Amino acid sequence: VSRPTLREAMKVLETRGVLKAVNGKGIFVTSTGDQSMISLLNFTKEKQNVLDVLEVRRILEKEIIRLVIHRATEEELDDLGETTSLLMKLFHEGKKQNHVDHKFHDTIYRLSHNDALYQLITSLETTMVSFWEYPLDLEDPFLKSIPLHEKLYFAIREKNVKKAQSINEKLLDEVEYEISQ
């Protein structure tokens, strides 16, 4: 087993409470029996689960983008523009932008003006956010996708459904590629 794979496994098991790192002493198993085995089995499925959720997200976001283009007001698009500007500013300054990235997508979901769709996509986002917060051995995850957010915003602003959907596909392709590695 390679060191990065082992580090990845250790991180996940630690965040799930199966392992505990004690400075100067080592790493210890905190739970035994079935629970730690279930956690271990869940870890092996982690990336595939995230990829499955990403696939559903891809399907839903295609329709969400169409709805946003037809339903969002100018004022709402201005708000999305402010979030986009902040995201790009943090990106260009080399600062973490995970929370602003999440806000960007959440804003798009809200601008669909479809409560059922919003609740569905945000329930999927809960799974994705846990991955963003504890990326599986990814140092600076999804940086290649950040510039595409600005392009997506401009395509939405132009009310160009096909272009916006295409850019969003590229954005999700980048995310999928990094997860798959």
Language model features: what each stretch is:
Residues 56-134, 144-150, 155, 163-174:
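Conserved amphipathic alpha-helical segments that form helical-bundle/coiled-coil interaction surfaces
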Residues 173-181:
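Short arginine-rich
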Residues 137-140:
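Structural signature of alpha-solenoid helical repeat scaffolds
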Residues 1-59, 66:
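Short linear motifs at protein or domain termini
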